[in-house]
C-alpha cells in the first residue's frame, strides 16, 4: 500500500467549510473514482488551529502517481486554494503490509 499526505495550513475561520467540502462527493467522490484508491481522511491538528493533512491511500505507488499525473490531484488542490493560508506540500510513503 502507498500513502500520500498533502500538508496544508487552512484559514482557521474556514476549517468547518473546508472539512465539509473535503468530505463532499465533489472531492472524496472524485478520489474514489481513481484506480487503486483505498481511502482518504482529513486529519486536523489538535495543537495548531488550521493545520491539516489530507491522507490518501492507494494500492500502489503507481496508482498514486497515475492519479497525480491525470491532473485530478491538481484540480482538487486548486479548489482548496480559497481555504489555504499557505502552499500545500505533498509527500509519499510506503506502507509495509
PLM regions: where:
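Short S/T/G/P-rich N-terminal loop/turn motif that feeds into the first structured element of a domain
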Residues: 1-52, 59-71, 85-97
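Short, conserved catalytic or adaptor-binding loops enriched in Gly and charged residues
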Residues: 80-84
Amino acid at each position: 500500500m502507498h500513502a500520500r499526505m498533502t500538508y496544508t495550513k487552512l484559514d482557521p475561520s474556514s476549517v468547518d467549510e473546508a472539512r465539509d467540502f473535503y468530505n463532499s462527493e465533489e472531492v472524496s467522490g472524485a478520489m474514489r473514482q481513481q484506480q487503486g484508491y483505498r481511502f482518504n481522511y482529513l486529519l486536523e491538528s489538535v495543537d495548531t488551529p488550521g493545520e491539516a493533512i489530507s491522507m490518501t491511500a492507494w494500492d500502489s505507488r503507481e496508482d498514486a502517481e497515475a492519479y497525480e499525473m491525470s491532473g485530478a490531484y491538481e484540480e482538487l488542490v486548486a479548489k482548496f486554494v480559497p481555504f489555504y493560508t499557505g502552499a500545500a506540500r505533498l509527500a509519499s510513503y510506503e506502507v509495509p503490509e
